[in-house]
Amino acid sequence: MRHSVRAMALLCGGLVISSAASGQSREQVNQEARAIFKELIEINTTDSAGNVTLAAEAMAKRLREAGYPEKDVIVAGPQERKKNLVARLRGTGQKKPVLFIGHLDVVEALRSDWTVDPFQFLERDGYFYGRGAEDMKESDAILVMNFVRLKREGFHPDRDLILALTADEEGGSYNGIDWLLKAHREPSCALPNSSFRPENQHKLFRSPAALPEPASRPAFRTRRRPG
C-alpha cells in the first residue's frame, strides 16, 4: 500500500520541541523519520515468513543510540519471532504513565498481487509504497522518531511516557497486546495509531501552531490484503 509523503512530514515535524531547539532542521527530522520508515518496510513482519523481533530490535537500537538506558528499552515476548518493543521515557512521576501503542506485524503480501516489491521501500510521485506503508509502519516510524527527539532534548514530562510496538495485531493478540497486558499492565490509558493522523493528532506531539491540512488524502484501490 502507499502513504502520503506530505502527511508523514507534517506529523514528524509536530513535536512540542521545535526543530531549532533540537539542533535539527525540519528537513533533517523528516529524513531521519524516512530512514526509520524505510528500515521498517524492508523488514518482513508477516505471520508466515516474517520476523517481528528483527523490527523490534532495530527500533530498540535506534532508541538506545538516542540515549535511552538498557533498562528502559525492552524487547520481549513469548515467541522467538514475535517479540514486542517496550520503551520508557521517564518523567517526574506526578501522574500515571501514558502508553503510545502500535503494531509491527503486517498482513500477508504476495508478490503476484503487487506491481512493486512489497518489501522494498519505494517513494514515487509523492507517495511511499510498501507492505505496512498504510497499516501501520508509517505511525510506528513517527512514534519512534518522536521518542528519539524527546530523549535527545532532555524532555522531562510529568509522567512516564511508554512506547509499545507489538506483534500479532493482524492475526491475533496472544504474543502481542495480550502478553503485554499480563506482563506490563500499568499505563493509565492508551493512544491508538489514529492519534497520529493529521486530523487527530495528540496534543503531546502537536506543535504550538496549528498544523496545515494536507492538500489531499491518501487514496488507493486493492483487490485483497490492504495495508
Describe each model-derived feature in a short phrase.
Residues 21-24, 62, 201-204, 208, ...:
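Metal-dependent amide/peptide-bond hydrolase catalytic core
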Residues 82, 95, 116, 158, ...:
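Short, solvent-exposed loop/turn segments at the edges of secondary structure
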Residues 47, 134, 169, 226-227:
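A generic structural motif
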Residues 7-18:
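Bacterial N-terminal signal peptides
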Residues 127-128, 134-213:
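Acidic/histidine-rich catalytic neighborhood of metal-dependent amide-processing enzymes
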Residues 42-44, 143, 227:
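A short aromatic-rich beta-strand->coil structural motif
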Residues 1-6, 70:
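Positively charged n-region of N-terminal signal peptides that target proteins for export
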Residues 24-131, 150-158:
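Acidic/His- and Gly-rich active-site-bordering loop/insert found
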